[in-house]
């Protein structure tokens, strides 16, 4: 495979970041840390406080948020005003919020059985959220639609690096070459002052349960230990029904079911009615706000994957425990434990903890992350895998971010060589 020159690719990333303009002028952020800037999942964004920040409403909120980049004072926010202002007018008049994001990832392996391998891929997201009922009230009805295009820069995208390195869980999975897909097409309805929320349509259950606050491959950790919940055999995008209840603001109960045969690359519903096999889930959580700390989330969830006769796959079930907490100032921490009883993911136990620090170096919208994870496999042919990942994300302009990160993978779980491997990565994200 042709190797990608790191200096040239890094230079291209930086050049693109400098060339991009961010959002139109937004309200200046208040002094100090904000929930938005340190990547908290918006408690009121979509279906459940337990959802990941990869859900479309949260991504749109991030695009249109009051970010401040270090190049903004030099006039790099001018060129896209002609594009952004009409989009704002559409939202003001119709309640239709549109957004586009382009994310590029470069990986370079170091050591282990696949050292010196380079991979790069891109991802383009087209997102929309249309409020058609109850705009300006708590009880809104919105239609969410997103499309995505993923492509590899060379023959092998970053998603292929994990198998070559022999990892139990890949350094990344999201950056592949699957092409065009329809990700989301669902209706979300709020009732009784948003205490009841119902989701119906095409979606991915992994966006709504089992996630921690820093679970976002686009702007946070990249390794799938942290950017997903790899102990759970989520089926992908397809028919989904979700219900979330909030009897009091500090408590939630979210449940749902999805077609067990859902595949993000396919748009079909026949298998649901022909076989009736479901992936089901339930999550309950407590979301207090501590006076000297800030908001937190403490949740427990269970899930069940039915036996799938069509694909000859066995039944599986498990549970997840999650703690997210903001600490005083610009810090947040998370911890997660996940258990799977079956063999679908080859992960029996997953335990991890991490932290995020916003404002390192005095730039309030920069984010630094550090996390540790241990995965224990089901099969005795694999071994325990431990991962340490750190990254720093620079807010270049209001809507452009550049990140660099490092992963250390001790004893990759399926490798023939029992030694530590490493992965360096660089990531660019542009959005408007």
List where the protein language model places each region:
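Surface-exposed coil loops of outer-membrane beta-barrel proteins
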Residues: 156-186, 193-279, 283
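Short loop/turn motifs that connect adjacent beta-strands in outer-membrane beta-barrel proteins
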Residues: 80-98, 131-143, 192-195, 249-250, ...
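Detector for outer-membrane/organellar transmembrane beta-barrel domains
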Residues: 282, 286-378
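Outer-membrane beta-barrel architecture
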Residues: 86-88, 127-129, 186-188, 242, ...
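Solvent-exposed loop/turn segments connecting transmembrane beta-strands
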Residues: 113-118, 271-276, 308-314, 339-350, ...
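N-terminal periplasmic/intermembrane-space "pro-region" immediately following the signal or transit peptide
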Residues: 20-109, 115, 131-137
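Outer-membrane beta-barrel "beta-signal"
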Residues: 420-432
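Transmembrane beta-barrel strands of outer-membrane/channel proteins
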Residues: 100-106, 143-149, 198-202, 253-259, ...
């Amino acid at each position: 495979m042709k190797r990608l020159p790191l200096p040239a690719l890094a230079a291209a990333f930086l050049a693109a970041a400098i060339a991009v303009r961010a959002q139109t002028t937004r309200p200046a952020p208040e002094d100090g840390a904000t929930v938005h800037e340190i990547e908290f999942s918006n408690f009121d964004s979509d279906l459940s406080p337990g959802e990941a920040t990869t859900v479309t409403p949260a991504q749109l909120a991030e695009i249109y948020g009051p970010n401040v980049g270090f190049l903004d004072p030099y006039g790099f926010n001018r060129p896209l005003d002609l594009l952004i202002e009409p989009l704002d007018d559409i939202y003001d008049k119709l309640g239709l919020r549109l957004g586009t994001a382009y994310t590029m990832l470069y990986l370079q392996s170091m050591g282990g059985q696949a050292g010196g391998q380079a991979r790069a891929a891109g991802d383009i997201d087209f997102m929309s959220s249309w409020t058609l009922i109850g705009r300006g009230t708590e009880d809104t009805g919105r239609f969410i639609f997103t499309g995505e295009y993923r492509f590899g820069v060379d023959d092998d995208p970053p998603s292929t690096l994990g198998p070559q390195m022999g990892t139990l869980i890949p350094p990344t999975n999201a950056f592949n070459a699957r092409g065009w897909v329809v990700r989301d097409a669902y209706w979300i309805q709020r009732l009784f002052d948003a205490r009841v929320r119902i989701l119906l349509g095409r979606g991915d259950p992994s966006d709504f349960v089992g996630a921690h606050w820093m679970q976002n491959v686009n702007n946070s950790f990249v390794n799938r230990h942290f950017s997903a919940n790899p102990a759970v055999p989520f089926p992908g995008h397809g028919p989904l029904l979700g219900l979330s209840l909030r009897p009091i603001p500090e408590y939630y109960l979210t449940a749902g079911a999805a077609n067990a045969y859902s595949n993000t690359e396919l748009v079909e519903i026949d298998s649901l009615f022909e076989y009736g096999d479901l992936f089901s889930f339930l999550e309950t959580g407590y979301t207090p706000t501590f006076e000297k700390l800030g908001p937190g989330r403490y949740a427990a969830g269970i899930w069940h994957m039915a036996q799938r006769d069509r694909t000859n796959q066995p039944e599986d079930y498990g549970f997840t425990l999650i703690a997210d907490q903001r600490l005083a100032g610009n810090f947040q921490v998370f911890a997660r434990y996940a258990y799977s009883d079956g063999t679908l993911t080859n992960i029996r136990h997953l335990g991890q903890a991490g932290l995020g620090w916003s404002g390192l170096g005095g730039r309030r919208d920069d984010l630094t992350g550090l996390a540790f994870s241990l995965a224990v496999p089901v099969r005795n042919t694999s071994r325990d895998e431990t991962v340490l990942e750190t990254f720093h994300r620079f807010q270049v302009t209001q809507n452009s971010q550049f990140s660099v990160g490092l992963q250390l993978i001790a004893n990759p779980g399926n490798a023939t060589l029992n030694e530590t491997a490493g992965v360096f990565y660089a990531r660019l994200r542009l959005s408007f």
